[in-house]
Each structure stands twice: as structure tokens, then as C-alpha cells.
Amino acid sequence: MQARWRFTDRSYGDLAIGSAGDLEQRRRSIVDAPWTWLEQVHGAAVVVVGSAGEHAGTRADAAVTDQPGAALAVQVADCVPLVLVGTSPSGAAAVGVVHAGWRGLGDGVVEATVAALRRLGATGVAAHIGPHIRRRCYEFGAAELDSVVCAVDPAVRSRTAWGTPALDLTAGLHHVLAAARVTTADDAGTCTACSPAHYSHRARADTGRQAAVAWLEQG
């Protein structure tokens, strides 16, 4: 099988749950298959999807599948949209999506998703990192920053472009991925706070959301 994924931006429309207009049509314009979307709660729960559309609306922050035609999605504005591709000697074995904010990163959502992919038969895992807020724009309270440092790694401690304490989500994610023996295949490199093409709750109080969508195809 082959893994496919897409990181959307404003040009795909608002993909927030409950957004105005025909959300289903916007989804199907991206991938014409039933979506498993999640009621995200900034936790570490992972759902295993056995058929297209299964577990849609479940309270979780990650999903994995080894079934072709099942589209998995997470919605974000500044948190990290992460696609994980589980590989085997014969190709893609499974795929997963993760909503990785600072709480989920500290609670182990990435590690839980990697473990779920390995239970589905993945012998290797590669990460594809989507657009998210970067350290130069992510001002963070000192006490909360200390808690993330303790939960993740000192590498998350940084400074904004204007010199105040900041959280480096990217550095934290790279640390977690390396510890989980995951290869980082690529990083979009885009900061949602800086990019007018993306929604950002922090920078512009946007209520809209972009998405990471991943699925498997036969072939």
C-alpha cells in the first residue's frame, strides 16, 4: 500500500468542526472518502480505525489505521499537525495523524500513536510535520513553560522575536520523535502565526482550522 496525506491551508476552506457551510463537501474535495475526525481534547488518546469513517467524533487526539480508503484527520490552528507513516518491507503498513499541542506533547500523544502503529505491523515510522506556530511567535507563561520543560525536554525553552519567554514546539517534537525512534522525513517549516495563508488562533484569534488528512491507497 501507499500512504497519502495533505496539510491544508485557508485555500481549502475552514475545516473546523461545526464551521459554516458545507463542511462535508470541503472534506470530500480534499479526499473523497469518509473522514474519521476527532473531538480533540489536548490529551493522549489514540483511536484505531478499522473501516472508513469509524470513530468519527470520538474524543481523542490521534488516529491510526491499516485499512485503505479510511481518511484520518486532525484540525489545528497553531498546534502541530503530524502525519506518521508506518512502514514495512513491502511498503506502507499503516498511517496515523496526531494533534500535538503542548499538553498532548507532554502527556505522550506522539509516543502513544507510534506504539499503535507498531502494533499494526509497522517496523519503521516516518514523521511528516505540518505548519504550526514557531518559537519566535509563541510567547508562553514562565510557570507553564517550566512544566513543559519537565514533561518534554529543556529544548522547548526559547525566546520570542521580541525577547520574551517562548515555547519551541518544534524542538520538543523533534526530541520526542527521536526518543521514539521515528525518522523525521520532512517539516513544512511554516509558522502559522506568520503566514497569512494559514489560520492562527494565537496571532489573529482565528476560529477557522486547517487540517492534516492521511489515508492509505492500494498499489
Regions picked out by a protein language model, each given a short descriptive name:
Residues M1-G219:
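Active-site microenvironment for binding and transforming phosphate-containing groups
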